[in-house]
């Protein structure tokens, strides 16, 4: 099983990614959206850490990497608007995750 993080959790594409992550037996560890989209996440991953601020999300991913508790992020699923993709790809690379 792999650990995922997701950006743009409240967007149009995110439910497809959430379903695929769940259907393949993987875990969503953290999610980001500037709007409160917990209702969408709860139906798939009720224990997922949810953030509305990018800085807090980024800090959380860094902490997961340093703690070495088996919760490091393997994949960052980017469902945010196109203009944010560059920053989110760089975040994925910095924490050792593959960007989707």
Q: What is each residue range found by the language model?
A:
Residues 1-49:
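N-terminal Rossmann-like dinucleotide-binding module
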Residues 52-100:
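Beta-loop-alpha module in the N-terminal Rossmann-like domain of NAD(P)-dependent dehydrogenases
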């Amino acid at each position: 099983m792999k650990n995922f993080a997701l950006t743009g959790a409240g967007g149009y594409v995110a439910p497809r990614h959430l379903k695929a992550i769940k259907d393949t037996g993987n875990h969503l560890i953290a999610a980001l959206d500037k709007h409160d989209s917990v209702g969408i996440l709860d139906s798939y991953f009720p224990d997922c850490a949810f953030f509305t601020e990018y800085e807090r999300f980024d800090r959380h991913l860094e902490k997961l990497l340093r703690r070495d508790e088996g919760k490091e992020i393997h994949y960052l699923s980017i469902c945010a608007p196109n203009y944010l993709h560059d920053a989110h790809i760089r975040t994925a690379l910095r924490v050792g995750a593959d960007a989707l």
